[in-house]
Swiss-Prot record:
Organism expressing this protein natively: Humulus lupulus (European hop)
Chief subcellular location: cytoplasm
Residue span of region SBD1: 274-345
Database matches in PROSITE patterns: AMP_BINDING
Organism placement in taxonomy: Eukaryota, Viridiplantae, Streptophyta, Embryophyta, Tracheophyta
The name this protein goes by in its record: Probable CoA ligase CCL5
Amino acid sequence: MENSSKAIVDERSGYCKSNSIFYSKREPVQLPQNHSVDVTTFISSRAHHGKIAFIDAATGRHLTFPQLWRAVDSVATCLSAMGIRKGDVILLLSPNSIYFPVVCLAVMSLGAIITTTNPLNTPREIAKQITDSKPVLAFTIPQLVSKIAGSNLPIVIIDDEVKSSLEKTLNIVSSLGEMMRKEPSPNRIGYRVNQEDTATLLYSSGTTGASKGVVSSHKNLIAMVQTILSRFGTEDGEHTFICTVPMFHIYGLAAFAMGLLSSGSTIVILSKFEIHEMLSAIEKYRATYLPLVPPILMALLKNANHIRAKYDLSSLQSVLSGGAPLSKEVIEGFVENYPTVSILQGYGLTESTGIGASTDCLQESRRYGTAGMLSPSMEAKIVNPETGEALSVNRTGELWLRGPTIMKGYFSNEEATSSTIDSEGWLRTGDLCYIDEDGFIFVVDRLKELIKYKGYQVAPAELEALLLSHPEISDAAVIPYPDKEAGQFPMAYVVRKGGSNLSESTVMDFIAKLVAPYKRIRKVAFVASIPKNPSGKILRKDLIKLATSKL
């Protein structure tokens, strides 16, 4: 294997000794040679045999591909008539729905920018995002409109028509239904949109600090679309995906509102996750792919006998898990209970447009604990966080990524951008990883989540894995607890299994027998559940706040 500069690259690991870069072993993505193309046009121009684009799992209401593209054109026509121009920011506050992609695709086709927000956010959190991103218009559903009532933004209601009660109290300018019924106009004001122009402004989860706006370009999204096509790329329109992941999140947005449309796939959308609704939808619509996060996969595993007896899941070919690597026990337990279903895994960040690494078949997933191999056209470095030295195979350091899906930067935040992306385009992920001799990435821990005990570094993930191996523990999280003498020590939050009377001393003794003295857990609190974000990652900062509030 050789890269473009003719440096010799090890075919097995993808590592190049001369520049200390790991290169992807996957086929590279092809980007359009025409630079004046937006992601909506790129997706809509692809040929496939798909018939139905989106189905609402609850109501059965659907959009065919012709209906989808007509709706996108109609909404874009109305937005243009309202004065929406290239570079304007549009806020979308909505749960998953078949109309979510219509709004996104219409906005981006004009060169305007979509910014999404979590429907569970408080009015204060949404107001903060509005102040930062400065949208000129908002789309939302009637049930959520009160959350942006104080913003004075003009609002389009995602409904068939506007109820008179809303019009009296808010600045409601239209309904999505009304806009979709508009005849598309070929004469609307058009702006030349380039691949480098901004398409989305998504706010990262902020698990390591204040939430920041991630600026992604049309090129980033087109590269994401091409990566998804390379993974699921049959263009026969025969795949059916269940969408349980939130569309306001980068993976939900890029995969379900964009990428999978290019292959003619049908996407069955759940407005919110409910396991019975999800399983019923798989059975009813003969779904072939189920993207999910590890907690849902664990629920499928724990209730396997009941689920197999009640639901026909014979159409299901693969589950796609993201958020955290799966253990050997989970993978083999799942394969044993669902022998016709493959497990695929993925790793990515909002800053990398949801792309970074993946396993693309069960054989790759059986490299237990891996996040996968580098995505197409992605390059990586493993960097010693203390010295800045780039490391080789099987050495642990911070994972840096570079490729066509890496964000442009953080919105109006040059300081955060320059501390995250260097002058050569390398994104510092904040994840401690190593890449093995076959090119598989293993995430060891979050760099910023390391506990410093008397100068020693302790990885919470290592202790969490040990805690989860205890027969009476169903979930656990480890955080740094401040200590005058040691600086910090490991504290565990533990969820007991039903009927367990596990004590703090028993938990501490259990870990003490398994780790070096500096890694020992020195405080335990028992809780009903561990707080996690929508992708299944532990909200460690919430637990740290809980622990330190009692000091």
